[in-house]
Amino acid sequence: MSNEGQCPFNHANGGGTTNRDWWPNELRLDLLSQHSSKTDPLDPGFNYAEAFNSLDLDALRKDLAALMTDSQDWWPADFGHYGPLFVRMAWHSAGTYRMGDGRGGAGRGQQRFAPLNSWPDNVSLDKARRLLWPIKQKYGQKISWADLLILTGDVALTTMGFKTFGYAGGREDTWEPDRDVYWGSETTWLGGDLRYDKGGACESQHGGNAGRNLENPLAAVQMGLIYVNPEGPDGNPDPVAAAYDIREVFGRMAMNDEETVALIAGGHAFGKTHGAGPADNVGLEPEAAGLEQQGLGWKNSFGTGKGADTITSGLEVTWSDTPTQWGMGFFKNLFGYEWELTKSPAGAHQWVAKNAEPTIPHAHDPSKKLLPTMLTTDLSLRFDPVYEKISRHFMDNPDVFADAFARAWFKLTHRDMGPRARYLGPDVPTEELIWQDPIPAVDHVLVDDTDVAPLKETILASGLSVAELVSTAWASASTFRGSDKRGGANGARIRLAPQKDWAVNEPARLAKVLKVLERIQGEFNSTQPGGKKISLADLIVLAGGAGIEQAAKRAGHDVVVPFAPGRMDASQEQTDAHSFAVLEPVADGFRNFVKGKFAVPAEALLIDKAQLLTLTAPQMTALVGGLRVLNVQTGDEKHGVFTDQPETLTVDFFRNLLDMATEWKPIAGEDTYEGRDRRTGELKWTGTRVDLVFGSNAVLRALSEVYASADGEAKFIRDFVAAWVKVMNLDRFDLA
């Protein structure tokens, strides 16, 4: 008898010990291939903008409004209205955004996937999305989950008597979890011990609290929280100390003090928290729950497990006497009572009004009234002197408060969408806001092919080198972040503060190049009939392309770098210098630049930069190899310029790096290397970790071998030009 059927089969394919188990520090090249077409179930030609614009938005709003009071037995609505639940859902979808790297936020519908779908701060939002499913099912691909989550929050506010500032669609769904977002290093939910620099070496962005400095780019105080611990720092119920955390994390998502107060007070005008019983009644999160739960989690064994017995945060607080109607109840209670510390039924720190009458409605029993309660972080708005002044001003001026909350809510839910050019739908507000990084509309006739050729000739005859032309264009365009769609060449903000002064851009050399290009621009524009002009933003990109064409010609290749005019020049008044400061790269491996020394190796920072530029591993490889031989570097060092003919577009970088006649040894620690002739010991090249990784990492070496091969040069030039044009056009949403 065969034993075949009795052999154990313990592990599925793809399981077992992985490369990352063996080598935990392996380079995360997989980050450059996430969200590929292989994970997208929609047809290759599907155009979301067209689909959204065909949507009957009014009908959808009516369906959502009807849902608000259509309480379901399987998950009853608090106070008979789902509005507060959906406000929380939208808030938590958008609230993961952080301005440090632009990641997180509502833009890709990631609340559906791990880890966000299983964060402790998102308990019960699995039910909110299931309540929405019949409506999503009805409208199909005309609205993404990402857009629907935010629209539902907007409708929820409207049905509770609040006038919102506007709504824009345009968020396209992804179909798998993000892998590029760093949420922290803790390995336990609600852990926070690893994200704070206890010695104070890290500098806080928004004021001092010695020994409590949050790691960049994180914008939450504990693993699995959206912002702060509502019980206070590390559970310490100190409203003043909590104000520090609030200011820090809200600041990291681009909110100032007024916006912060407006969001907290406005959001807490509605609904309640849930802590009906001890947390040990709550089961596993969705990602760990059994198949039979069908993607739901946190099954609650306390009482009925729902309604009045719901457990989410463990806090049991209702802020207002009118929790499903916009009003000033939050401020009225906050300043109308003195508060004493108590504990929720689940044992969490919260506050109850002293000497108060029960005025707060019960969420599921109209015959009952409760005492007013608050969170520690609510009291921060009263006991922090800055927040208190703003709060009292809002309390005394309800219209000012309503406008501030409307604007802050719109910013919260649209901050990661990028410029207004990406906004879809009839409800887009007409007012232009500084945080949208506004760029003027095109107001002139654009240049055409008959203008481009002589302009290139003028540029190449200007005395500027290939390296200067290419590096300036790269500096302008490579600020783009695919995370929140900020930055890029459009606007020519390379000539404005703060970008013109960034060390990576070599301000003196940049000023020299810009002066020449501005002269060429002025001479061209002053001689054109019919209102034809070229913006400096366009000219910078055109000049970079001209430099590449010249470098390719020197290598014996005639190429044309595609150029699409249509960029405009922003003004300093349209540029929030503080907001743009976060776009300054701490490292740009494409220019062999690292600003200081970091625990993260330079090659990992290159991957991070490439991922923000939406590049694939082959595109990154082609760009690094090309920029090196074009001598596009920050500073005077020639690290990685593995060629005897710089500013010529060759495959020398790859061929010389892979040449076994060269032996590499580290110098100056681990970050710089010498390449010497293996036989004579003669110094041939110097390189950085970013340079050598293309020969060291097995995957990058395989890609480099393609270009280093005898038949690789023509392909390399094609690939380099294509990747270059991609970066130059990343912010050209009008070309999509």
Curated annotation (Swiss-Prot):
Formation of the three residue Trp-Tyr-Met cross-link is important for the catalase, but not the peroxidase activity of the enzyme. The keyword Metal-binding applies. Keywords: Heme, Hydrogen peroxide, Iron, Metal-binding, Oxidoreductase, Peroxidase. Heme b binds at H268. There is a cross-link at W91-Y227 (Tryptophyl-tyrosyl-methioninium (Trp-Tyr) (with M-253)). InterPro entries: Catalase_peroxidase, Haem_peroxidase, Haem_peroxidase_sf, Peroxidases_AS, Peroxidases_heam-ligand_BS. Bifunctional enzyme with both catalase and broad-spectrum peroxidase activity. Shows peroxidase specificity towards odianisidine, ABTS and pyrogallol, but methoxyphenol and 2-chloronaphthol are not peroxidized. This is Catalase-peroxidase 2. The gene is katG2.
